[in-house]
């Protein structure tokens, strides 16, 4: 690794210099789940490969809306940025009308939400968001694709050269 010049260089720097068994940790149902530096990078690379498979190109926008700090947000951020796309972080407590405006104005192609409360508001306006192809949730919800489908889509490493 040369020097850290981009935000998504940090996990790689950490892996090389200070690898951690608990690089990130998120509490799910009262239990802390730790993610190692290597797993963080592996999942971010899978997200990158999946987004490329889904047709995301440099400068395309991917929105992330989370009610809390969580590991998935960090993984998505690195996965989005390292393929040259742009993460559009959106404040989780704005109105549905504000989501419509921000998602349209940013021309977001995909949206990742944390939970049902955010999903409800996004779905209220999803049909009015012209570039939006799909919404995924970090939480497992009945009426929404799960972000793990994206990670699984990126399991095939054939796009790794572009990452």
What is the meaning of each model-derived region?
Residues 57, 109, 133:
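Short acidic/polar active-site loop segments enriched in Thr and Asp
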Residues 81:
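Anion (oxyanion) recognition and catalysis
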Residues 117-163:
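ANL superfamily adenylate-forming
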Residues 92-124:
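Conserved ATP-dependent adenylate/AMP-binding module captured primarily in the ANL superfamily
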Residues 84:
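Structured binding elements
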Residues 2-24, 42:
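A short N-terminal helical cap/helix-turn-helix that marks the beginning
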Residues 88, 112, 134-136:
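Hydrophobic/aromatic beta-strand patches that form the interior of the parallel beta-sheet core
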Residues 23-78, 95-100, 148-154:
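Conserved AMP-binding/adenylate-forming core of the ANL superfamily
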């Amino acid at each position: 690794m040369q020097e850290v010049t981009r935000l998504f260089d940090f996990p790689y720097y950490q892996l090389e210099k200070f690898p951690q068994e608990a690089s990130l940790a998120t509490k799910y149902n009262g239990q802390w789940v730790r993610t190692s530096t290597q797993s963080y990078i592996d999942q971010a690379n899978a997200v990158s490969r999946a987004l490329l498979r889904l047709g995301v190109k440099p400068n395309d926008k991917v929105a992330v809306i989370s009610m809390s700090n969580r590991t998935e947000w960090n993984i998505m951020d690195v996965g989005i940025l390292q393929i040259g796309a742009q993460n559009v972080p959106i404040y989780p407590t704005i109105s549905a009308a504000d989501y419509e405006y921000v998602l349209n104005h940013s021309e977001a192609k995909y949206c990742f939400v944390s939970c049902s409360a955010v999903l409800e508001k996004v779905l209220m306006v999803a049909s009015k968001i012209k570039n939006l192809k799909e919404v995924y949730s970090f939480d497992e919800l009945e009426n929404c694709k799960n972000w793990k489908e994206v990670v699984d889509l990126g399991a095939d490493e054939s796009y790794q050269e572009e990452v």
